[in-house]
Amino acid sequence: VKLKGPAFPSSSKTIKQLIPASRLNPSIQYYIRAYVWDNSSGKYIYSDVSQIQLAAQPEPISLSWTEESYSELPSAVKVYKTTSTMEGRNFNAWYAIADPKEVDFRVIYPEAVGSKQTVATQATNAGDCYVLINGAIFGNYNIGAIITEGSMTQQWHGEIEGCYWATDNQLYNITRAMIGVDSNGNPGAYWVGVPSQNRFFYYSSPMTSVVGQAKYDSVSETYPYPCVEWDPYYAISCGPMLVYDGKIMVDHSKAGSHYMTNYECWDANGVYYGNPDRTALGVTEDGKIVLFVCDGRIDASKGAYLPELARIMKGLGCKYAMNLDGGGSTGMWVKGPGMVNYKDDSWRTVKSTCGFFAK
């Protein structure tokens, strides 16, 4: 298999080209070599062969969960809470789980009508919501694409801008993690690339952009990999992808001063590092959807590092999982009690949410 590589560096600088875990089977040894087209000889030049194998996967984190009883929820929606310790730290978290064939999974985007709203306001305004969590990371706009009722709701903002993200003041073409459901309630998880407005390509592996390393051309039907067919009815993109096909996609290994698995070029301090409040969205082996939040930055709960969040989601049975906006944006609303996680001041208004609704 020949994979098209990154742009050739303009200087003699050595760059790393990475192979994501999503493309590797941990039980298989692979033989790889780099290649480049040589114009003078009219043929490919190949490097020596290297042998690689996916490193052993981190163990899932299993916590003690208690089912919460809320009379206004249907039996198809379950909510669980843990008040425990993780890696020696206090840890409080909640997750809701449901089959999207029994209840609706939807994405709400109030910015489409020109406003930001709290999670609770979005849930209440919907009228038929059971559980709702905050959605995509945002600055002046949501980062990524949002699909509602089969159409792109917001303008695509996939660029990584040096003035906003820590990307050495260069533009990196990327793909974004996305999770959603089709019109029949079948969940899917992919990376989405959008070369231009209203042109979507979905992939089962990410473009492996790494700040200061490989830079890639814009996506196409065949680049960085052949795209896959997917027709989401409701979907939200954020990231990074935490778990894909059962494999944990994130760690804290570095290339220079940047994280090697930060393929989507997220801000390292604000997203990739630290242990703040976290929000995540997952899909289990049997097609259920998991909505997760944890408290952070308080004595009662010290939050989760990104690799820990991936291990937690895998421990909940997620075959696929994606990080959502965290920190002050983290919030879970449940019909009956309202907001269930901790907040020491007013709830932040957010630009998108996702959750479970009546069919």
Model-derived features with residue positions:
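Residues that act as N-cap/strand-start positions at coil-to-secondary-structure junctions
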Residues: S11-K13, Y46, N90, N173, ...
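Short glycine-rich loop/turn motifs
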Residues: N90-Y95, R176, S237-G239, N275-A280, ...
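Short acidic-glycine loop/turn motifs at beta-strand connectors
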Residues: D99-E102, N140, G180-G188, V243-G246, ...
